Amino acid sequence: MLKIITSTLLILASTSAFAQNSDKLVINLESLQKPGWTQQELANAALVTDFVQNLMNNHNFDYILAQYNDSSYVQHNRNLPDKITGLVSFLSEFVEDYPDYTYDVKHIYVDGDYVIFHSHATLKKDDRGNDQKGMNIIDTWRIENGKIVEHWDSIQALDTFMRFYSLVSGGNIENSNGVF
């Protein structure tokens, strides 16, 4: 139990320290936490929060590779490469084109080893908070032995540009893991 609490606090501290002095969006796990979560579910939510904060908002890819690359991460989004290295490679190129890309988490749900984020992703700072722009995303991660091992998502493009982007980028199959 002490290990879970200590790990959770360290993850939250590392996430906050990196994003504190920037204009990056910060995921506030405390405000999104549900009262019925067990200590293990809170630890799972903190793990995914740290992962998403550093990957999608801080774009701290070196941190992601150092902290999460040892897991056997299976990507079920067929448009993304498999494994953490594939995901980091894709996103590092993506944020070169869209450096203000952010992931505003609206809800977090946890059921045992499954963590679900409902989020609003945008490409531009000016679009943050505008539910007519960007993408409505529901992500599900599976945790096993304190590691993120699987990811599924469902993405709804909210504006014409994102619908066009989804159309032109949606045809490339980057892994053979299946969507379920």
Residue ranges, per PLM feature:
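Sec-dependent N-terminal signal peptides
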Residues: I4-A13
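Short, low-complexity N-terminal intrinsically disordered segments enriched in polar/charged residues
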Residues: A19-Q67, G170-F180
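Short beta-strand edge/turn micro-motifs at domain boundaries
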Residues: N136-L167
